[in-house]
């Protein structure tokens, strides 16, 4: 397995040396023949929004329900329609113990005060305010977070009815498709997002925004005139909200099959060697920290950015950090509206099961531990996570994350446009 890491690290070093290092210095290429710029230009805001809107017809897509299964079927059909016809499914069982206690708004309005009443040692009103997951530290005001479990919190009767079915234990599936490389089909980057949600809304941001992003990248990379030297897998995980069960099932079932040619001599690799895993989870909402009253701004903040995270405590922290900065350089060169920043506290997302096996990063709207964990997104797991909640400024942040991933992956897999 270590050979995979050596291959990936060598590829990242070569890429930085050949081009992304220059982009990181801010020297953007205006070359009209640049295939990466052409591919990035094929990402359109209205198309991204339409794909996301399509997902919301299935409500919150809560795992173990008909609406979730219907959404998996719809995603597979959409992938096939855009040319990613090699769809497959991972099947696994999810049989949790029954929940104890009542429903309602878990974590909201209960517990000790979140914010200190005393000034900081230097006399400031608010400063360090505890720790978050993934090794993060929280600063500034916090607001309570939690999962809404009361269907009556959803005021839209039609949506409430759509989301009324409760999960049942049993078999689960998730779908992926693969763009096969022309010269190195046995090497692969995995691009993922989770398609399930909860909270009795539409799971538009968490994680319809990431799912739509991955589907849009599948559309562009599988266009008839696009070739890649290496393979790309587009994976839409299930059961993220219950503990990363879908991505964990993928790792458990597929990691030992990496690089095996089947049948021998066929040139076919059902599970190419993993070179990197890139997750996308909550892409739209960077409105800043809550104020003393717990209120978050209605508007995207001027300093909004895409957060690229790796986990500094993982076995492959150095390689994952290098991958993160490849994506940062791609953003510097090709993103149109918002910058990107790199942080070391990736956590609580579907790249976690991969992070000790292959270089792994996560792209998102905020830092997961320091920001999301402190309540920066008031719609997280809430009935207000609706398509209509977000504006074009929000959708553009998601599109900029798509531009970043597309540009980085296009260079890592050596994408070309046939006929140019």
Predicted regions span which residues?
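Metal-dependent peptidase/peptidase-like ectodomains
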Residues: 237-350, 356-360, 367
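Structural recognition of the beta-strand scaffold that forms the well-ordered cores
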Residues: 48-56, 87-89, 174-178, 188-192, ...
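N-terminal hydrophobic or amphipathic helices/low-complexity stretches enriched
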Residues: 24-72, 76-77, 82-89, 179-181, ...
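His/Asp/Glu-rich mid-to-C-terminal helical/loop segments that flank catalytic regions of hydrolases
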Residues: 369-420
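Bacterial N-terminal signal peptides
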Residues: 8-19
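A non-catalytic alpha/beta surface segment that caps or lines the substrate-entry region
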Residues: 50, 54-178
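Second-shell loop/turn segments in exported
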Residues: 34-42, 56-67, 160-166, 196-208, ...
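Alpha-helical metal-binding/catalytic segments enriched in His/Glu/Asp
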Residues: 175-177, 191-245, 405
């Amino acid at each position: 397995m270590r050979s995979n890491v050596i291959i990936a690290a060598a590829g990242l070093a070569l890429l930085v040396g050949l081009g992304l290092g220059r982009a990181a210095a801010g020297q953007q290429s205006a070359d009209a023949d640049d295939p990466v710029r052409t591919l990035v230009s094929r990402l359109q805001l209205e198309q991204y929004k339409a794909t996301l809107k399509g997902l919301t017809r299935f409500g919150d897509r809560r795992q173990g329900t008909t609406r979730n299964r219907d959404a998996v079927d719809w995603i597979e059909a959409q992938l096939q329609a855009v040319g990613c016809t090699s769809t497959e499914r991972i099947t696994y069982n999810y049989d949790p113990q029954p929940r104890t206690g009542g429903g309602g708004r878990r974590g909201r309005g209960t517990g000790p005060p979140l914010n200190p009443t005393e000034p900081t040692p230097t006399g400031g009103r608010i400063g360090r305010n505890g720790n978050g997951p993934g090794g993060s530290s929280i600063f500034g005001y916090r607001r309570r977070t939690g999962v809404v479990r009361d269907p009556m919190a959803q005021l839209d009767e039609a949506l409430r009815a759509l989301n009324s079915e409760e999960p049942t234990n049993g078999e689960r599936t998730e779908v992926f498709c693969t763009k096969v490389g022309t010269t190195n089909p046995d090497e692969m980057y995995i691009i993922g997002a989770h398609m399930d949600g909860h909270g009795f809304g539409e799971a538009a941001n968490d994680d319809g925004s990431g799912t739509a992003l991955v589907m849009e990248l599948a559309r562009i990379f599988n266009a008839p005139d696009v070739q890649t030297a290496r393979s790309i897998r587009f994976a839409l995980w299930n059961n993220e909200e219950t503990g990363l069960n879908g991505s964990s099932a993928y790792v458990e079932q597929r990691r030992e099959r990496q690089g095996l040619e089947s049948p021998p001599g066929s040139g076919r690799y059902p599970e190419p060697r993993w070179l990197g895993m890139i997750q996308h989870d909550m892409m739209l909402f960077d409105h800043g920290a809550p104020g003393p009253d717990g209120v978050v701004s209605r508007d995207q903040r001027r300093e909004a950015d895409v957060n690229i995270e790796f986990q500094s405590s993982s076995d492959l922290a150095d390689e994952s950090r290098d991958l993160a900065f490849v994506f940062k350089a791609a953003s510097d060169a090709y993103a149109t509206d918002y910058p990107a920043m790199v942080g070391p506290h990736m956590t609580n997302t579907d790249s976690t099961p991969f992070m000790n096996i292959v270089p792994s990063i996560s792209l998102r709207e905020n830092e997961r531990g320091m920001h999301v964990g402190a309540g920066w997104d008031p719609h997280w797991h809430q009935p207000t996570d609706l398509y209509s909640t977000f504006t074009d400024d929000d959708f553009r942040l998601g599109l900029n994350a798509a531009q970043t991933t597309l540009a980085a992956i296009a260079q890592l897999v050596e994408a070309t446009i046939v006929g140019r």
